[in-house]
Amino acid sequence: MQKYTSEARQLLALAIPVILAQVAQTAMGFVDTVMAGGYSATDMAAVAIGTSIWLPAILFGHGLLLALTPVIAQLNGSGRRERIAHQVRQGFWLAGFVSVLVMIVLWNAGYIIRSMHNIDPALADKAVGYLRALLWGAPGYLFFQVARNQCEGLAKTKPGMVMGFLGLLVNIPVNYIFIYGHFGMPELGGIGCGVATAAVYWVMFIAMLSYIKHARSMRDIRNEKGFGKPDSVVMKRLIQLGLPIALALFFEVTLFAVVALLVSPLGIVDVAGHQIALNFSSLMFVLPMSLAAAVTIRVGYRLGQGSTLDAQTAARTGLGVGICMAVVTAIFTVTLRKHIALLYNDNPEVVALAAQLMLLAAVYQISDSIQIIGSGILRGYKDTRSIFFITFTAYWVLGLPSGYILALTDLVVDRMGPAGFWMGFIIGLTSAAVLMMLRMRYLQRQPSAIILQRAAR
C-alpha cells in the first residue's frame, strides 16, 4: 500500500502543474472570446469560427510531438541522458516541417469558411483574417511544445505551468493593443486576437528556451554542437510513435465538431443546452487529461529503469487516482448541475436541457477518465498504434452512429434529440475505456524482456 501512496504523491506532483497550465491555456481562449465580443458580436463569431478550424490543425501537430515525452522519460530513466539532446533537436526539425503544413492549411482555410451555409461575407472575411494572422504563431506554438515535452519527459512540469500563465498575462495587454488600436498600432478588431495570440506563442517559446538554456538540472543535456541536420531514422521513429496520437486527437476533436453540426438544425434551445453541457464537461476533462500526461512520464521513466513491476504500479496508481477524481467531479456535476447551467444562461428551457445533459455527462466522466489515463499508460509503453485504432473504433464506429440513431431516428426509441448524442458519447467512451484496459492488461502480461525491448526503441 505504501508504494501506491508514494506513487500517487509523485503523480499528483507532476499532474497539478499540468492542470494549472491547461487552466491558463483555457483562460487565454476565454479572454480572446470576451475581448473580441467587447469589440463586436461579428468579431466574436469570427474568432469562434477561426478557432474551430485552428484547433484540429494545430492539435494534429501537438499530438505528433507528444511522442517526445515517453522517449525522453525512458532515456532519463535508463541513464542515457546524453542521447536526449539529439532527440529534442529532431523534435524541433519535425515541428518546423509540421508548422509549414499547418500554415498552408490555415492560409487556404478561406475556402472552407466561405463554403459554410448562409455565412455573412463580412463575417467570413474577418474569420479568414483572424486565421491568417494566427497561423504565424503555429511555429512558435509547436516549438514551445517541443521544449515543454523535453521538460515534462524529464519530470519537470512546473516550467510549462509558469510559461502558460506568462502567456496569459502577455495576452491581455497585447489583445487590447491590437483589437482596439493603441500605441500606434492599427485597430484590427477580432483579427487583432489572432495577431496577439501568435505573438504570445512566440513569447512562450522564447521564455521556455531561455529556461532550458539556463536550468542547472539540464546542463548535461544541452546542445553544444550546433543544431545539426535532420536525422531520418530518429524522425521516422518519432512520426511512427506520434502519428497515431495525432490522428486520435484529430478524430476526437472532429467528433465533437460533427455532433455540434448535427445538433445545430434542432433549434436554438437544443444547441445552447448541448453547448453548455459540452463546455462544462470539457473543463472537467482537464483533470484526467493532465493526470494522463503524468502517468506517461512515470511509466516511461520506470520502464527506462528496467522495472516493469514499477511501471505497473504507476499505471494502476494513475487509474486509481483518476477514478477517484472522476467520482468527485461526477458528484459535483450531479449536485450542482442547475446552478452551473444558470451561470451560462438564464433561459428556463435551456437550463432544464443543460441540466439533463449534465446528468449524462456525469455518467461518462468515469469512462472518460479511464480511457484518457489508459491512453497515457499506453503512450508510456510506446504502444501508440493501439490508441489510434481504439479511438477510431470507439468514437466513429460505435459512439457516433449509435448517437445518431438515438438522437435523430426512431429505429430503437423515439427521437431523443441532443440526449441521444450524449448516450452515444457514453457508449463510445465506455467502449474506449474497456478496450484501453484490455490492451493494457495484454501488454503487462508479456515477458519483461519484450516490454523493455519495445520501450527502448
Swiss-Prot record:
| Keywords attached to this entry | Antiport, Cell inner membrane, Cell membrane, Ion transport, Membrane, Sodium, Sodium transport, Transmembrane, Transmembrane helix, Transport
Molecular function GO terms recorded = antiporter activity; xenobiotic transmembrane transporter activity
| Residue spans crossing the bilayer | 11-31, 53-73, 93-113, 127-147, 160-180, 188-208, 243-263, 276-296, 314-334, 350-370, 387-407, 418-438
What spans does the record annotate as topological domain Cytoplasmic, numbered to this chain? 1-10, 74-92, 148-159, 209-242, 297-313, 371-386, 439-457
List the GO terms this entry assigns under cellular component, sorted alphabetically.
plasma membrane
List the Pfam families.
MatE
List residues in topological domain: Extracellular.
32-52, 114-126, 181-187, 264-275, 335-349, 408-417
> Single Gene Ontology BP term?
xenobiotic transmembrane transport
Primary location group? membrane
Lineage: superkingdom: Bacteria
Q: Where in the cell is it found?
A: Cell inner membrane
User: What is the recorded membrane topology of this protein?
Assistant: Multi-pass membrane protein
PANTHER family of this UniProt entry? FMN_FAD EXPORTER YEEO-RELATED, MULTIDRUG RESISTANCE PROTEIN NORM-RELATED
Q: What family does this belong to?
A: Belongs to the multi antimicrobial extrusion (MATE) (TC 2.A.66.1) family. MdtK subfamily.
| UniProt function note | Multidrug efflux pump that functions probably as a Na(+)/drug antiporter.
Name the record gives this protein: Multidrug resistance protein MdtK
